[in-house]
Amino acid sequence: VCSSDLAAPAVNAHFKLLEPASWVVEDDKGDPQKLAPCGGTYADPGTPTKAVTAVTGGQKLKIVVDETVFHPGHYRIALARKRNHLPADPAVKTHDTEKGPRSLSAEIAKPRPPVIADGLWPHKEKPTAKWETEITVPNITCDGCQLQVIEFMAEHPGVREGGFSYHHCAVLNIKADPAKPAEDARWK
């Protein structure tokens, strides 16, 4: 649900990953969150929470984010066995403004490994509630899997440490459900 607030957008967007638990201690705005693939900054890589969320393959997992500083855009969710296997930030189209180049749009990926969902919660106005969805966890066994949530920011000049996206991750221990079809080979 979005309001019709017509206030000028802030220069920076921020969000907190509320569910599942973030891998890094986040402040009230969600920082540190700039660097891909999972947040941190050059000056502050972040303090690990050591949080691990246990889930069963083939089951639903609730994702909740709180956009603490508004910027128009959308979100993407991805999953990989290791952080270095998470997808790169989306390709971005920019346009010239009187303040210099600004992001206009980002490529939205089709949901196939490692991307679970993209183009989530597209918005041009300040949200009035937390963003929530449920994803189906792949029926795999994976200790230490990395669930990534990124926010693409439109009408943004970009930041040196994160381009046009902010990043959060959660660590999942996934146990395949033997009652469901065999592990999906695309997630190997």
Where are these regions (language model features)?
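C-terminal segment of classical bacterial N-terminal signal peptides
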Residues: 5-11
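Short, small-residue-biased leader/transition segments that mark boundaries at the very start
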Residues: 1-3
